[in-house]
């Protein structure tokens, strides 16, 4: 299984084969794709530019470069069209099994 993204404007599908077993999780309007590595219990993520076919790095590196903050391991589920809000998930193992912890990035509340 490989990550795939369907462009509703051009009606074309881009299959990303760079990462082996992976899933397409989210893509922005400007073609930045967020890929979950693995197929059952995604534990990490990659960021990929669909327009240029370029690997933009791990989720953590991309978030640090774009927002200047450190996030836990994981992958991005959603980014708002304006880029101000990001939702992500991190897998965490324990004696009870694997839990999936959600995290987010949002601007500070107005005072």
Language model: regions and residue ranges:
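Conserved "turn/edge" positions that cap or connect secondary-structure elements
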Residues: 1-111
């Amino acid at each position: 299984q490989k990550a795939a993204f369907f462009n509703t404007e051009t009606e074309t599908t881009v299959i990303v084969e760079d990462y082996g077993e992976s899933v397409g999780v989210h893509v922005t309007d400007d073609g930045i794709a967020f890929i979950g590595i693995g197929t059952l219990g995604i534990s990490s993520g990659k960021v990929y530019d669909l327009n240029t076919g370029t690997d933009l790095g791990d989720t953590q590196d991309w978030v640090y470069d774009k927002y200047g903050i450190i996030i836990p391991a994981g992958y991005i589920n959603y980014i708002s069209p304006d880029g101000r809000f990001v939702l992500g998930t991190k897998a965490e193992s324990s004696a009870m099994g694997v839990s999936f912890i959600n995290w987010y990035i949002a601007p500070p509340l107005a005072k």
